[in-house]
């Protein structure tokens, strides 16, 4: 069977500006995959950087994979689809990842999938409609409300109408804006103000009064459509869904730490799990996730951000792509990321069994420290993202270590202590303390 993995990118790519390191390397992971599944032929059609598929920066490629690189000038949907078709694949799989400032790569991958399906090539990728629903937070909100899923109450703010008098000088009174403020006043405090099209929690504001909400919306920072929602209180979780055409696996959830504003931050949060305590009504949650998967007709990998508040599960966001927890779930299941992608496509069988794992952040590390970290016997993998042109400290990047794969939570916490002792110069107290708090949350429930 010939399998094509495809990966796209909408941003300008310049080698050397962003440095992505994965340990084990993509090359070694491809080699291990081929050794385990010699019956498969692997092709990667990609625009750089090809996150998770290619060792960007060192230009080392596995001899067990054929790479087809797509230049920016040839990156139209039709051209990429043609390049995939030229490989004569038995199946094509979208390997979609996140981008800034807009988390929209699943939309392009869905358009490519539409072309491939028209050419009778089996393709694992979410539909265009699904990708658009997940990309736009307001459309997500509408979908959830219309289908009776628990989500926060909110008010949509259309930016052009909110400032309609700027382009229509005849307007003396902006009725739309007054209506927005009237609706916001009916929401329960505190509130979170979201960019409807932004990545994750970037650009969000948490406010504790209606006056603060009004101030944010009237400020220069408000330069696009916004969604103002009630800011629900409770622990934060993530869960993933794998499969297609009604055949889905819903994982156990992982619990997430939050920042000082109560938001999950990709660069700062700690993940720990699985969470199975009876208090959290996991069977009910999984049934709702299956209902979600079937309504969206998911195809491949998807991730859902959740909150457990007032003894109920609430959906915060849906990501129609590989997420920041996908590798951690692969570790929990005892398989590689590539095997998880194949499993989500229905190509290989895996018996889902979840061991305790943790995803912990470190500051940027040198090569020696990265390798030392990766060589710990309980470490599944280490990733580092470095922005070499960062202008602010918070933009320089981070390292993350995924470790554990243990039968008991205590064993993972023992592993954490080893890391704290071995890498005391680099272990930041906020992450260590957050990990301890998450463990207590799991143990106490």
Q: What positions do the PLM features span?
A:
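ATP-binding N-terminal substructure of ATP-dependent carboxylate-amine bond-forming enzymes
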Residues: 1-123, 163-165, 422-432
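Active-site nucleotide/adenylate-binding loops and adjacent lid/helix of ATP-dependent enzymes
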Residues: 4, 133-227, 233, 245, ...
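Conserved hydrophobic "DFG−1" position in protein kinase catalytic cores
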Residues: 206, 241-243, 306-308
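ATP-dependent carboxylate/phosphate-activation module, predominantly the ATP-grasp catalytic core
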Residues: 211, 230-296, 319-345
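A short glycine-rich, hydrophobically flanked beta-strand micro-motif that places a catalytic Asp/Glu
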Residues: 299-310
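Peripheral (often C-terminal) accessory segments that flank ATP-dependent C-N-forming ligase machineries
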Residues: 340-445
């Amino acid at each position: 069977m010939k399998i094509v993995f495809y990966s796209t990118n909408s941003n300008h790519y310049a080698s050397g500006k962003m440095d992505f390191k994965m340990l084990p390397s993509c090359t070694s992971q491809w080699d291990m995959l081929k050794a385990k599944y010699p019956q498969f032929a692997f092709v990667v059609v990609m625009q750089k950087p090809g996150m998770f598929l290619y060792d960007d920066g060192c230009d080392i490629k596995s001899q067990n994979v054929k790479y087809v690189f797509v230049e920016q000038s040839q990156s139209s949907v039709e051209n990429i689809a043609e390049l995939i078709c030229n490989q004569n694949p038995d199946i094509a799989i979208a390997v979609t990842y996140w981008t800034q400032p807009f988390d929209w790569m699943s939309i392009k991958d869905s358009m490519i999938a539409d072309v491939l399906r028209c050419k009778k090539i089996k393709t694992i990728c979410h539909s265009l409609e699904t990708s658009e629903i997940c990309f736009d937070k307001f459309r997500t909100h509408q979908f959830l409300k219309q289908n009776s899923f628990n989500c926060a109450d909110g008010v949509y703010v259309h930016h052009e109408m909110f400032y309609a008098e700027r382009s229509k000088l005849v307007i003396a009174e902006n009725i739309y804006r007054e209506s927005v403020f009237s609706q916001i006043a009916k929401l329960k405090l505190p509130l979170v103000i979201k960019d409807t099209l932004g990545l994750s929690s970037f650009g969000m504001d948490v406010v504790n009064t209606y006056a603060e909400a009004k101030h944010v919306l009237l400020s220069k920072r408000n330069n696009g459509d916004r969604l103002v929602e009630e800011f629900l209180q409770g622990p934060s979780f993530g869960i993933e869904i794998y499969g297609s055409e009604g055949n889905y696996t819903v994982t156990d959830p992982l619990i997430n730490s939050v920042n000082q504003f109560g938001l999950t931050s990709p660069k700062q949060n700690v993940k720990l799990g699985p969470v199975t305590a009876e208090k959290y009504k996991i069977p009910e949650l999984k049934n709702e996730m299956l209902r979600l998967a079937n309504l969206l007709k998911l195809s491949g990998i998807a991730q859902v951000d959740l909150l457990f508040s007032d003894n109920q599960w609430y959906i915060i966001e849906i990501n129609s792509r590989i997420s920041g927890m996908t590798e951690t779930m692969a570790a929990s299941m005892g398989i590689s990321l590539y095997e998880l992608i194949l499993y989500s496509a229905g190509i290989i069988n895996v018996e889902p069994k979840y061991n305790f794992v943790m995803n912990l952040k470190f500051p940027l590390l040198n090569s020696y420290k990265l390798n030392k970290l990766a060589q710990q016997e309980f470490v599944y993998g280490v990733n580092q993202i470095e922005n070499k042109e960062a202008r602010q400290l918070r933009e320089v990047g981070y390292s993350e270590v995924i470790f554990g794969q243990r039968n008991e939570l205590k064993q993972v916490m023992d592993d954490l202590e080893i890391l704290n002792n071995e890498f005391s110069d680099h272990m930041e107290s906020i992450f260590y303390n957050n990990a301890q708090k998450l463990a207590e949350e799991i143990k106490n429930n």
